[in-house]
Amino acid sequence: AVKGSRLVYHSTSGLTCVDSADGNVLWTETVPIPNAPPTTKEASRAKRRGQKPTDSAVFSSNIHPTLVLTDDIVFCGIHGSVTAKSLVDGQTLWSASAGQNYMKSTDIFVADGLVWSRDLKGRDPGTGKVVRTLSQEMTGPMSHDRCYRNRITHRYYLNSASGGSDFVKLTGDAESPNPWARSTCGLAVMPANGMLYNGPYVCQCAIATMATGVNGFYNGSGNSDRRFTVRIEPRLIKGPAFGEGGGAAASANDWPTYRYASMRSGVTPGRTAEELATKWKVDVGSHPTAPVVAGDSVYVADRDGYTLYSLDRENGETRWSFIADGRIDSPPTYHKGMILFGSRGGSVYALRASDGQLAWTFNGMPQRRLICDTGRLESAWPVHGSVMIFADTAYFAAGRSTFLDGGIAVFGLDPITGEMKHSRIMQGPYEDDTRSFPVQARAQFQLEGCKADILSCTGNELFMRNQAFKPDLVPMKSESLKTLHLLASPGFLNNSPQHRTYWTVDRDLRYGGAMGKFGSGPAGDAIAFDGKLFYEIRGYAPGRNLPGRGRDLNQLELYSVYSGSYGGMGEKEDKSAIPAMGRWEQRWQTPTPFAGHAIVAAENTVMAAGVPMLKGYTVEDTNAAYAGEKGGIAWLLDASDGRQLQELRFDAAPVWDGIAIAHGSYFVSLKDGSVVCLSAR
């Protein structure tokens, strides 16, 4: 650390101060660096071996001394303690306990004339006397502070006691906990420009509510004690094809919506050929969605081109196209002669399927507020492309999180007229109306609340990720559900699975994703599930456990397709952190030479597709494969035993969850902007 003409550094031999201009030693002080107490993992390992846990090494990649300089004092933090020394001669002024975050160095801050550390005590810099102690009420649902350093501004102490980003005012007793917003391990959040920036979230604690990606947040209410709220103000615009619905319903051989049906099963009852060849391939732009198929038409959107296409199912020729007011992030839904879809611009559209003429467009939010998302302007309340049809009602959600921008608005519309039948704002929930304290879930490091996603349903129960609804959009508790349903912990459209994300079949998102153990249910990167049988593709070990052999396991063995069957709920629900929800049995496992990006199933075949992961790959090869630079691979498998029937190669990688099956053919969207039809050879 440098202050004016003084440079101070800490080594294993002690604390040294030198002249910053010429390096001459001004003083040295022996400051012992005590070994850290053993970590939980080290203690457990020693216990298994019948040994006494020993202290950790002096330094590690995560924990090292902290130095902070003022004009006349140097503050040194080591393993949860802080020592103040004179910058002039190194004499000790005072020492005190300070605490430290999970597996991180001791924090020392100088703000508002005081010295602060993790214990929220403001000390006199010269004497160490505690002058002010901040109070913090919400310290969960996470069981420990995050594994990164805290931050401070001239007004707030920022820590992660709740597991997220918590603001504690330096004067008074104001507290603003945000357990739904954390940052990347080791990096921490960054307060700047009147905003809070956080990096990508790579964990599973509070995964149902935690913001993902790189975000910039600000206080939209203009008042730290008041929540930002919105109200629903429906606006319906009628087009030239208004009122002309009532066409033919989709058949069982079609694939009329995302993942075949509102259950999002990814399974069709139809059969396919067991040897395929390319029938046609067409370019639809830069970033196609998964396709859907109804009758003699294929519908697919160019996400970044804001354009929906209708293609001829026999030859791939374009029949019509329609440009929306924002990105279309997922495929449309066919319903009785109509095509319905949402956009990231915040609108929902209904088109006549035959020619793409507009029937109506709907927007339910009170203002057109735009933010920047991945380099493009879009609504603060975006709508996913895939609209769910249930009981002649079109359901969708507008928004991102129940803790952002006033919450998520959920709607149910008449698909023919666009008339609003049901609506609800989902915000928080918070403990009361007077302060913004989110409600903690009963266990497993979770919050009440949710993030927006493509809606699904099973029976009469509707789902938006972990949040359930009745058909009239009255919220339901997970423990009251009568059925299990397909759940994607990062969201259906998240195309970057990490070592702690998973898809599963359950009532709620749980910590651990069943650890990937059969008997505890499916937990792959993507899943096809028809209510009885499931097929899942894995590239990571679910639950982050390498089964059996730990670090000796060949990582390529993790890339597999698994199939199992569901045997009912059992006598009671397992509410542990590592659940066994229902009775599951393994059917077969087939190792694959690729990391899976998509899986779907027909009565007789299963197709899994992804990017190559081959023996001998270097780190550079692996990165290039994930970037789509090594093309794509698909395996056609026998649904009954997992036997490989055929390998297909593509010039480009398949898009995430980008396969449909209809009328005996497979339709695959690729990252080079093309759609491929594979039919009987």
What is the role of each PLM region?
Residues A1-R681:
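Noncatalytic, solvent-exposed loop/strand surfaces
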